[in-house]
């Protein structure tokens, strides 16, 4: 009887022997060690607690463990390793017509697995839940020919491959009817898509490509700016654009002369294409209006002045005409427009064919009318052939009070002296018949500007070159773009 009670059984189960009043915990432990012989190391120290009635305690302890000994459970009482879905599927597939009632499912499970016979854990309720909640089981109404109770249950045709390799121990996935519908729909869509792509004619693709090409071409043509070369007439003069509003503002290019001096004279195709043409459109359609000097002399009064379109410019070279004309913006920066050839080729040269044409550098100021009467004596007389030639060939750039050609262009209330600084080109010898240009950059009162003009007039008289061929420039003290010395009058012939 001692062989049935090993030491591992009470220790593994965590069972403490029942202790009476005469027993102690150590005597019980010693009895357990002596019974199994497992705790040999503890037998010697536990012997000191031994009692004369040791044998009877040992026998009593063995009898005390008798009722709690786990009996070997028969195989029929072990729960089968199948899910309720697998059990129901077994019952349905075992039926001759592949359909069975709920009572038939119960009978099949109890006959096949005896565990469910005596077990009252509510497995029948679990069977009913699985039948209702799983879409793989379909309820079939009972026929009138077969009287009875309850409806039949069968498997969905798409759920026969629900278990892997026919093994009810492993199920692939939870069966859902919508997944089957999705799979079928996806297959149909793929098949239709392949057929559609295969039957699509090549002409439709070509038509689509042509439409895309046309849209791209329209986009490119819409974004391309208007260039001066595209609007030239047969005689070389540039005709102003017709569909542009005169209210558009001209954006002049602002650079220092040093950075632009690296540009060499080239072909007429070197004109910047971002040049605004609204200035020329405005001068061909609207005579501009001049501000009067009653409000005092300021930068606002020397805004960009529009000149008349060159009507009699047949003798003028096309590079001079095609170059853009800008004025002084209401800021302290000097603006210039690079032309086709070298950047600062002057229109103040007597022969207009010098250098193959060039850009212009204008500062058209309305304040020039303040001393135009005083300076008319220093200019070349209007009745000389040289003055007439210059004024005829340069109707836009040199307009004086002694000529009638300025009035023929019909839009100047006050004359302007458009000047080009010749010292950028080192061509002081070719200058003539033009007056100097002043560049006031900040707002000054009337008296200071008048004094500056007087000093320039005196500088013209005392120039080492005669007044007709000298080009003078007067800079205000605040103009730090070129030089910062105290002298305000520079002789262009030095450079």
UniProtKB/Swiss-Prot annotation:
Residues 199-224, 257-276 have a biased composition (Low complexity). InterPro entries: Fork_head_dom, FOX_domain-containing, FOXC1/C2-like_FH, TF_fork_head_CS_1, TF_fork_head_CS_2, WH-like_DNA-bd_sf, WH_DNA-bd_sf. One of its GO terms (cellular component) is nucleus. Pfam families: Forkhead. Transmembrane segments: none annotated. Its main location: nucleus. One of its GO terms (biological process) is closure of optic fissure. Residues 296-312 have a biased composition (Polar residues). Residues 178-198 have a biased composition (Basic and acidic residues). Residues 175-322 are annotated as: Disordered. Keywords: Developmental protein, DNA-binding, Nucleus, Transcription, Transcription regulation. Residues 79-173 bind DNA. One of its GO terms (molecular function) is chromatin binding. It is found in: Nucleus. Coiled coil: none annotated. Monomer. DNA-binding transcriptional factor that plays a role in a broad range of cellular and developmental processes such as eye, bones, cardiovascular, kidney and skin development. Acts either as a transcriptional activator or repressor. Binds to the consensus binding site 5'-[G/C][A/T]AAA[T/C]AA[A/C]-3' in promoter of target genes. Upon DNA-binding, promotes DNA bending. Required for cell viability and resistance to oxidative stress in the eye. Promotes cell growth inhibition by stopping the cell cycle in the G1 phase through TGFB1-mediated signals. This is Forkhead box protein C1. It comes from Xenopus tropicalis (Western clawed frog). The gene is foxc1.
């Amino acid at each position: 009887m001692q062989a049935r009670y090993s030491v591992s059984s009470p220790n593994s189960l965590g069972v403490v022997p029942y202790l009476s009043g005469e027993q102690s915990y150590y005597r019980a432990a010693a009895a357990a060690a002596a019974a199994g012989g497992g705790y040999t190391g503890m037998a010697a120290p536990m012997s000191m607690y031994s009692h004369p009635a040791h044998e009877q305690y040992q026998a009593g302890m063995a009898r005390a463990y008798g009722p709690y000994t786990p009996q070997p459970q028969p195989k029929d009482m072990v729960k089968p390793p199948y899910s309720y879905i697998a059990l129901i599927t077994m019952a349905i597939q075992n039926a001759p017509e592949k359909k069975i009632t709920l009572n038939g499912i119960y009978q099949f499970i109890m006959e096949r697995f005896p565990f469910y016979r005596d077990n009252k854990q509510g497995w029948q309720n679990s069977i009913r839940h699985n039948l209702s909640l799983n879409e793989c089981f379909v309820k079939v109404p009972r026929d009138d020919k077969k009287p009875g109770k309850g409806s039949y249950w069968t498997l969905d045709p798409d759920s026969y491959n629900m278990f892997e390799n026919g093994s009810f121990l492993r199920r692939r996935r939870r069966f859902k009817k919508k997944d089957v519908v999705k799979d079928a729909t996806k297959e149909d869509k793929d098949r239709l898509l392949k057929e559609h792509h295969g039957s699509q004619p090549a002409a439709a693709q070509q038509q689509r490509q042509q439409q895309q090409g046309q849209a791209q071409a329209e986009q490119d043509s819409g974004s391309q700016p208007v260039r001066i070369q595209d609007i030239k007439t047969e005689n070389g003069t540039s005709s102003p654009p017709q569909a542009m509003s005169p209210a558009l503002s001209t954006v002049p290019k602002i650079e220092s002369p040093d950075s632009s001096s690296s540009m060499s004279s080239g072909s007429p195709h070197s004109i910047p294409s971002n040049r605004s043409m609204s200035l020329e459109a405005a001068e061909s359609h609207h005579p501009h209006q001049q501000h009067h000097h009653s409000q005092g002399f300021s930068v606002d009064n020397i805004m960009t002045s529009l000149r008349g379109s060159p009507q009699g410019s047949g003798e003028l070279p096309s590079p001079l005409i095609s170059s853009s004309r800008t004025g002084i913006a209401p800021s302290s920066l000097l603006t210039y427009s690079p032309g086709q050839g070298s950047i600062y080729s002057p229109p103040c040269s007597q022969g207009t064919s010098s250098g193959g044409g060039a850009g212009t550098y204008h500062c058209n100021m309305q304040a020039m009318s303040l001393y135009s009467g005083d300076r008319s004596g220093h200019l070349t007389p209007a009745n000389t052939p040289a003055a007439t030639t210059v004024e005829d060939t340069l109707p836009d750039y040199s307009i004086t009070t002694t000529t009638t050609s300025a009035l023929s262009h019909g839009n100047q209330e006050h004359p302007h002296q458009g000047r080009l600084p010749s010292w950028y080109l080192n061509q002081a010898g070719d200058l003539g018949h033009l007056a100097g240009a002043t560049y006031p950059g900040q707002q000054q009162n009337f008296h200071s500007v008048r004094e500056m003009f007087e000093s320039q007039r005196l500088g013209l008289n005392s120039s080492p070159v005669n007044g007709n061929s000298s080009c003078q420039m007067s800079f205000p003290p605040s103009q730090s773009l070129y030089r910062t010395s105290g002298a305000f009058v520079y002789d262009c012939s030095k450079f």
